[in-house]
């Protein structure tokens, strides 16, 4: 699997063996006890190892005459983005110093599931990351097969692509071609995703996906705007702000549907009436938001995972006053701070962190 490139020294092969061993140990520890079996372990290890094998230094990609100008320009910003993040408390890592050009539109495809008449999401538990409400697959066909297995159990299933993910500092994550979008929001999108994934490598609480994603969303939103503003990239700043207005509108509408459906599920009407009313509510949501497919309970649960607690983080930041004190407060939070796995609300946790770390 490890093929030495022309002109590279023999230490590359030794380093390859070391990285391969780390991949195996990480994936084995994280996934081997999972209920999805050895096939999930195999694809996870192979997928991660493939990325590490294909990664090349960003400087080399920039110098390569075959690298498109658009990609070259975006890659040249990565070092500056990383340095900017560390100024505001993100942990310096060796991630995003290499580049991988993928031959697919997404790096992984993510599956999640929920009961059809209750917002009760399926969870998978692993030693390193705790419980998680979704699984990622490097091969789209594998993801589809797993989604069909979940559907056969009578569950609502969501299958979506992801342009990036973080190994939480276990590996040096590369910049992926899937992280380099087209259009006027290309640079702002790259700034956002590098900062977002860097937050995960800075703070990660096992078993608390909504907390982790909401924290990353809050921090990356603030810092991405500050980065663009401080670098005089006003057109990109306007683009990202416009995009977030629309994103917030869609998220609010998703939340409204969640609240309406949750009340329906908890009511005493018959199962048949619940299913009929659910179909009506979701059909309206699809039409209003212009979705390509009808959403379901798993879709709405995933929507709640990202950015659903921004007000709590904003209140904590205002109380702490500086990024240094904000991160000090965040680092007082661990798995024991929550009442159980996958808490959907944690304003009390954030308030307690402020009490401990940001006293007047």
What are the functions of these language-model segments?
Residues 5, 11-24:
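Bacterial N-terminal signal peptides that target proteins for export
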Residues 52, 65-79, 137-141, 184-193, ...:
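Soluble non-cytosolic domains of exported or imported proteins
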Residues 251-360:
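Pan-zinc metallopeptidase signature
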Residues 80-247:
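Acidic/His-rich structured neighborhood in mature extracellular/periplasmic domains
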Residues 63-67, 79-90, 199-203, 220-232, ...:
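Sec-exported extracytoplasmic/periplasmic mature domains
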Residues 52-66, 124-132:
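Acidic/histidine-rich, surface-exposed loop or edge segments in extracytoplasmic proteins
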Residues 22-34:
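Bacterial N-terminal signal peptides
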Residues 34-56:
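Bacterial Sec signal peptide processing site at the extreme N-terminus
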